[in-house]
């Protein structure tokens, strides 16, 4: 005699059905790769004057999001959604996640009035950055699915070490973006990523402003 499912088991069963249905909607069958464009917002020229900052190469220390991602593709992979052998692996176009992060950081600093340089000739701020997350995902949610409000989510997280004149400060800059979609498409992934980049830019600029204020306060002591 078959035992009746508990409410918890019924909930987990429904989640698996919902997740599989969504993935079949996305891919039909199997795993495919979606290549997305991540834009650097509000591009401006490097200021001729202003405090100098050197952004070193960004270290990619992100986890392996899915074992299905080949080792050669991991530097470009932005996770995606994979369940029960079906899904989408999202990959960044033309460059690596670490290099794109560095480009975003450089532009954010230029927009603050910093002059970015490849090396420090006089007094400057040197930034060492480690990329801990740059990913997209699509959580399975029954209520969102039945109401056609499924979300694509994007997250960026970078640990930064700022050094200037013997002083060291660490902070984490983060960004989050969400996009409610009806049709799973490259464009909808890109909307979530665009919002995460803007959020990350704001977080980095705020942390750098606090860095400047702290450095100025210590200089006056």
List each model region and its residues.
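Short acidic, gly/pro-rich beta-turn/loop elements at beta-sheet edges
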Residues: 63-66, 139, 168-170, 183
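Amphipathic alpha-helical segments
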Residues: 99-111
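Sec-dependent bacterial lipoprotein signal peptides
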Residues: 1-29
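Short alpha-helical linear motifs
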Residues: 62-65, 147-151, 196-200
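Short secondary-structure boundary motifs at beta->alpha junctions and helix caps
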Residues: 79-96, 161-214
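Intrinsic disorder/low-complexity segments enriched in polar/small residues
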Residues: 10-16, 129, 160, 219-221
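A structural "domain/chain start" motif
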Residues: 29-100, 206-221
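Surface-exposed short loop/turn segments
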Residues: 30-40, 112-168, 179
């Amino acid at each position: 005699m078959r035992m009746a499912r508990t409410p918890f088991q019924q909930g987990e069963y429904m989640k698996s059905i919902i997740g599989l249905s969504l993935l079949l909607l996305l891919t039909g069958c199997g795993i495919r790769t979606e290549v997305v464009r991540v834009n650097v917002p509000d591009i401006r020229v490097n200021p001729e004057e202003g405090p100098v900052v050197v952004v070193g190469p960004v270290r990619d220390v992100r986890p392996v999001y899915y074992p299905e991602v080949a080792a050669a593709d991991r530097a470009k992979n932005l996770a995606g959604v994979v369940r029960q052998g079906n899904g989408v692996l999202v990959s960044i176009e033309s460059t690596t996640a670490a290099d794109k992060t560095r480009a975003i950081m450089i532009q954010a600093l230029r927009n603050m009035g910093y002059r970015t340089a490849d090396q420090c000739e006089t007094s400057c701020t040197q930034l060492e950055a480690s990329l801990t997350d740059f990913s997209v995902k699509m959580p399975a949610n029954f209520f969102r699915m039945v109401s056609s409000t499924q979300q694509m989510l994007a997250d960026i997280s970078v640990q930064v070490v700022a050094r200037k004149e013997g002083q060291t400060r660490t902070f984490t800059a983060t960004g989050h973006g969400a996009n409610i979609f009806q049709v799973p498409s490259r464009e909808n992934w890109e909307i979530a990523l665009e919002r995460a980049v803007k959020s990350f830019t704001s977080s980095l600029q705020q942390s750098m402003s606090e860095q400047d204020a702290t450095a100025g306060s210590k200089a006056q002591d």
